[in-house]
Amino acid sequence: MLKLSFRSLTSRLPRLSTLVVRGYASVANTGIEASNTSENNLNIQEQLNDNDKKRLKQIRNIGISAHIDSGKTTFTERVLYYTGRIKDIHEVRGKDNVGAKMDFMELEREKGITIQSAATHCTWERTVDQIEANEKQKTDFEKSYNINIIDTPGHIDFTIEVERALRVLDGAVLVLCAVSGVQSQTITVDRQMRRYNVPRISFVNKMDRMGADPWKVIQQINTKLKIPAAAVQIPIGQEDKLEGVVDLIQMRAIYNRGSKGEKIEISQQVPENLIELAKEKRSALIEKLADLDEEIADIYVMEEDPTPEQLMGAIRRTTLARKFTPVLMGSALSNVGVQSVLDAVCDYLPNPSEVENIALNAADSEKPVSLVPSSEKPLVALAFKLEEGRFGQLTYLRIYQGTLKRGNYIYNVNSTKKIKVSRLVRMHSNDMEEIEKVEAGGICALFGIECASGDTFTDGSVSYTMTSMFVPEPVISLSLKPKSKDTTSFSKALNRFQREDPTFRVQLDNESKETIISGMGELHLEVYVERMRREYKVDCETGKPRVAFRETLSKKVPFSYLHKKQSGGAGQYAKVEGYIEYMDGVEDESGNVVDCEFINKVTGGTVPTQYIPACEKAFYEALKKGFLIGHPIKNCRFVLEDGAYHPVDSSELAFRLATISAFRTAFLQANPMVLEPIMNVSITAPVEHQGGVIGNLDKRKATIVDSDTDEDEFTLQAEVPLNSMFSYSSDIRALTKGKGEFSMEFLKYLPAPKYVQKELVDAYNKQQQK
């Protein structure tokens, strides 16, 4: 008999829909209410023919995401092996020096980390036992599934790879370490999944390690990630004796046998020493679902035991609604539990017809349009990743609607260019398979087409566009100079890297004439410098890393500026009046923050309309280089209210110069300040080194915001100025005898201390005087 909870008796939640809404910003912005999603799902299904319905039911587009070193790429390697995609298993840092299939870059195999996201396609044949169980329960299922997988980096410096993968995927597997649990990048990935409304299942990996604690990890998912979670399995054995899992839904034992865990042995008998734990965790699963799903709540109130079919249905509904994540467990390295995750991907993650994707109709005032994954509808596809391949630029596409065929002409809605599809391929890491067509719901790649990441392609019959992904701002820069005089290869490399990676920026410093590259961290820039050497044979000298400071104002200041120049012939005359003030940043439809704006409040024609764009352009140009230390200005609103002009001497140039001078004068009177980037730093190390680590952080002016200590190790979360974090890699190694690790990501900008601002201003003024 099940124990009743007051919460379950009193809460009567409506049944959750099985449609995932992937709006161009959020559900609220699309005008589609969550309560109407079942109706929208019905509309999508009605527009699909029988062949499309069957085809789509067999497709899963998933990403595999995790904190660095959680075993994500090792897990993907097992998936490829068990699905028959590769013939043997190679480890990330294996002794055979082959490396994991999905880490195909030489640098990835040397460093043992994933740098670029890699795509592959595999087919999962359900186990005979699983097929029989589903048939017995009359579950709606398929015997084989086509799974498109994107393996993403775990390091925060390459977070854009996760962003663009999640933008086009329907579901995800979140891999967590059974020892470390929820870490800093886990929280970042969770935030990205929420941004793109991606349902996820969770896999607690490394259950074979000493100190593995899946229950702590599940508690952290509930509390730190704030998404209800419960185990659907418990482990059989611990550490090096791990041999399988107990399936809490079917109440049976699943063992991995064979030298590589390829043989599945299923027993209806749960090991005696685990029966009580299995009952306890199954009850916890049911109680959690009863709080989230009406059908299970009804069963719970009646004190009945739900059937496996009812449990699976509830898990699917709540997972698709992003109200719940089922937690599986095992060890990819020990070949335990991976096949169960593949079954869960098929059982609980959505197929393309269960995800509503929204486009904007450029021909109809950008009204939102719900796309239908029908092979017969007009083509709509999104370019989500660019890569330089052996045969030219490789463009990855997600097909949202229609069919893309080799030999067809397609239209780039963003550039209005017409392009012929000469080669169509399906990627398997860095290998390619030629294909003739890709239907809605599929992922493919094209060769030799000029486009940008985020461009939308159609067959020309519609003018739909899909918003691009969120692109974080770079936080670190350094100067770069080729050692040789071969600037052609240098320029080629920089142009290519900018096209491939929106977070990698290049600019020329007009004063020093240096090339400045900017990115998400030291490792990010280090990788590109090394790739330039290896792939383009260009050795570079690099300067000291620079922090991406910003400038802002702290009070509202009016301006009135007259630009007047008379030197014979045509003169220059322009007057602008208004004010500047501080503004908070607001998110746009793509999730990017807009923190500066120009507002025109001119009435009566005192500034003719033809000169307003020149004023606006001048303001945005001036923002690029501030007046305190030459860094970009943020959080600033420029309001133009009045002005004056001369019928002969006024021009766009005159109003441009007047605007820049007015802005400069007002900005310097508005109590300007320097902002410095604050990083969210996560550190894990053995407990005996905790004092030294905290002392070192204190010297770096860190603010510790959270800490967690286990028997053997501790984890700290701290907010630290990026300017204080240089050389920290060396320090943490020395402080912890090589046993500590850390990660950091940009958190926010805060005013720099006065002494830091004075140093920066003095250095900038000194440089200007040279």
From Swiss-Prot:
Gene3D superfamilies from the UniProt entry: 3.30.230.10, 3.30.70.240, Elongation Factor G (Translational Gtpase), domain 3 (3.30.70.870), P-loop containing nucleotide triphosphate hydrolases (3.40.50.300), Translation factors (2.40.30.10)
Binding site for GTP: 66-73, 151-155, 205-208
GO BP annotations, alphabetical order: mitochondrial translational elongation
Segment annotated as transit peptide: 1-24
InterPro entries: EFG_II, EFG_III, EFG_III/V, EFG_IV, EFG_V, EFG_V-like, EFTu-like_2, G_TR_CS
A GO molecular-function descriptor: translation elongation factor activity
Stored PROSITE patterns: G_TR_1, G_TR_2
Protein name in the entry: Elongation factor G, mitochondrial
Origin: domain of life: Eukaryota
Similarity comment: family membership: Belongs to the TRAFAC class translation factor GTPase superfamily. Classic translation factor GTPase family. EF-G/EF-2 subfamily.
Gene name as annotated: mef1
An example Gene Ontology CC term for this record: mitochondrial matrix
This protein's UniProt keywords: Elongation factor, GTP-binding, Mitochondrion, Nucleotide-binding, Protein biosynthesis, Transit peptide
Pathway listed: Protein biosynthesis; polypeptide chain elongation
Annotated compartments: Mitochondrion
Occurrences of domain tr-type G (ranges): 57-353
Biological role stated in the UniProt entry: Mitochondrial GTPase that catalyzes the GTP-dependent ribosomal translocation step during translation elongation. During this step, the ribosome changes from the pre-translocational (PRE) to the post-translocational (POST) state as the newly formed A-site-bound peptidyl-tRNA and P-site-bound deacylated tRNA move to the P and E sites, respectively. Catalyzes the coordinated movement of the two tRNA molecules, the mRNA and conformational changes in the ribosome.
